[in-house]
Amino acid sequence: MKFLASLRSLCSALFHSEHIDDEMDEEMRLHIQNRADDLERSGLSREEAERRARIEFGGVERFKEEVRETAWVTHLDSLFRDFQYAIRNLRKDRRFVAAAIFALALGIGAATVVFSVFYNLLFNAVAAKEAGRLVVPVRQDLDKAGDMGWDAGALYCRLSDLDSIRQQNHVFEDIVGYDGGVVQLRDSAGTYQLNVAPVTADAFEFYGVSPLLGRGITPEDGKPEAAPVFVMSYKTWKGEFNADPQILGKSYTIDGEPRTLVGVMPARFQAYGRLRDIWVPIPWTSGTTRSDQESSLALLARLKPGVSVESASAELDVIVKRLAAAHPDDYPKRFRARVLSANEYLMGPSGYGAVFHSDIQLKNILYDLLAAVLMLLLIACSNVANLLLARATVREKEMAVRAVLGASRGRLVRQLLMESSVLAVTACLAGCAMAWFGMKGVETIVHQKAWANIGAETVFGLNAPVLLFSLTATALTTLLCGLVPALRAGRVDLQPQLVGNGKGTSAGLRHGKFRAGLVVAQVALSIVLLVGAGLMMRSLYQLTHVDMGFNPKNILVVAFAPPRGHSGLPDRAKMASQEGQALIQKDVERLKELPGVAAVAVNNTIPGYGPNHGPQVTVPGGTRVEEAGLSECDENCVNTLGMRMIAGRWLSTGDVRTDQYVAVVNQRLARDMFGDGNPLGRQIQVKAFTQFRSRGSRWAGKKPPDPPQDAVFQIVGVVADVKNSGPQQPAVPMAFIAPLATGAFILQVRTNVEPASMIHAVQEQIWAVDRDEIFWILDPLEDFLEQHTYAVPEFGVALSGPLAGVALLLVMVGVFSVMAYTVSLQTQEFGIRMALGAQRGDVLGIVLRKGFALLVSGILVGVLASYGLTRFLASQIWGVSATDPWTFGGVVALVVITGLAACLLPARRAAGVDPLVALRYE
């Protein structure tokens, strides 16, 4: 009630101030009347009593003024009057207002966009309930090279082991499992190849996102007797089924099994595998040991409230090592298990936020961008501060008059800060509008196919934290822009302004060094931003022009999926069987006949992405042991992929068809095993194929049928190194053999036309061999490289480039404003010079030399600062030094050219001064 009363009082004071004055008059009259009554009772006449009462009470207006000064509402009223005066003043100088708001809006808008990207990717990337407690169990092979080793990443375990982890842990509120792959979905309209995520039946309740239509998968769906169901993604529902609202309840055949669609998820839901099309429940009964369920699942867990990541990691490590003792083939000899927060995992080397086998991580790029945008905000603030200083100099006579009339220094400072606040708030609104369009642009960029892996569940928008940042930026810009000009205006010298010409010329020259210093700071900061953006661009160029050892152009990749058991999980061992390999060979022969296809090869890897670890290789009778990548491929790989033979020959048709134990090695393996000697005709021994797993523990201890053990291969050829660990890593030792161990199930189809245009034809040719064959056609190999190798640095360039461009634009505005103002102050000087015989070129040179001096000072400071700061960028660039002279030289040249261009217009104006007019100029 007290609050409501105070609120009513405030509103009354603000909007009905005349009533407050009337009430005070009435109260004062009553006090005087009461005192007069007392005096009258003491024997004085009424007239004398009233006279003495008024004398004792004093001036009524004085008391009313004292009451007003003690009322806090008066301060609000004073601020409101300052606000009104600021609006009237700013309306008189619309060009200044437009320039200031434009500069600040650019800074605030750019800062808001980058902060939205930064916050939403780092802290709001997961759409699940209580996402802050989501963690991903991971495993690291301690015998591999750091976190970038092949076995680093998600922890995979058996279904039965997942049940054990659930029962034995005390740190997880819940833990679920999921897998990934491809299925064939059929209905009366056609056949679709879709990405599937088999999930434990409680996974949708765990994630906690409400479906757009219908329901999600429930624990009852995982019971063996439950009817087969599935849930569809928004993307698939809209793209493949035209957003049919009547789709629920329809039955589809998925890998030969009828399943009923029970739900469609919202657009943001991308759980359990980015870009999944459908989700199916994994049938599971605690304690079951059916062989087709002994595949492996990735895990996702939610910590109990109050449990730290460190304590959860310690307990998980103990449990998983206990499980590893029971299934030693599933795990490396030395490893550790731990948990990472879901956001940290997604942004790290194992998630979407890193270049394949690289130190370039989106998380670090985002921190660099945040620092860059704060520099941009400083440039905008110094720009506006320069404009405000110029304006304050012109208004010094006005400030002097107000000071003479009784305005305190604090009141003058407050008035100018109010003007800065009006500018900043208006710029904030304009900046938020710019940011809204900017974030639409970011979403458009991120949702391009090449960048589809970045922030699949992230929504970029003006949410509460982003708006809070924008308001904070507004408050800081008010202080940074307005405080120094306001304090300088508050120290105005009265006498020169009251007796002088009132134009502020002396003050302008007095403040010139400070304003020049602000321009130097702007130039220096822009140099830092441009150098950072330039290094990232140069790095991206180097990255995209690495010789990978093969030709990725016009290559379409087709990956065959293993058949699935009752659980919905893949039977990978069956893929390596003779029956499975024979079926793939029929597909190869069929595709070779397709018009537009130049060649077809089959192997077990995607070029550029493995294998980069595998079994141990040695020379029979020797002691040197080398871990080598092992690629099982056919006779067409070398020509189809454009690999270069160095010596000897490639695998022949006879080698592949008769499973000959011959091998082609790359230069790295030949050099490591035989030095400078000739490797042709020599032998290598593969110690054990059981060490060769496709990803983590995906084989889960199940070996392909009859793999050779300690097999000896004769080297028949040497091929140029292929970068199978990504473009940034040196080539790993590799051997190429016939499909003997895991089988070859990935096709590389080289086309004579655009690969994407062949997708439908390739699909139909494979289905002509076997309509039930399950496969997925990946993007053309160039696009695949784009997504997994170039997307993260491209994202950094896409954001840092515009920031650097805006910084350069603001510097041009800053240099132009300072030089234009300097020219206006020196109009008389230029007129006198020209009257004494100076030519237009002489005046032009004076102005350009002053501008060039500012630029050189800023460039020197900026280059020195860049040399110190770019070391923080060193881990995010590749193929170029952090102090690359070409980048620094290009940036300096760009700043000099644009800076002199900004000086040119004021210089030409100075050179065009009429001496007669200038000599009359005040």
What are these regions (language model features)?
Residues R95-L121, A125, A380-C381, A424-L429, ...:
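Short, strongly hydrophobic transmembrane alpha-helices
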Residues R338-M375, I777-V806:
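Peri-transmembrane interface segments
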Residues E66-A98, P349-S358, L388-R414, M418, ...:
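Alpha-helical transmembrane segments of integral membrane proteins
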Residues A371-A400, L412, A475-A489, G534, ...:
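A hydrophobic alpha-helix feature that marks transmembrane segments and, especially
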Residues H511-E922:
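Conserved positions within well-ordered secondary-structure segments
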Residues D37, E50-E56, V60-E66, A111-L248, ...:
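Structured, solvent-exposed hinge/loop segments at the ends of secondary-structure elements
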Residues M1-A100, R302, A337-V339, Y345, ...:
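Negatively charged linear elements and acidic catalytic determinants
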Residues N383, G406, L412, G837-V843:
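Glycine/proline-centered hinge or cleavage motifs at structural transition points of membrane proteins
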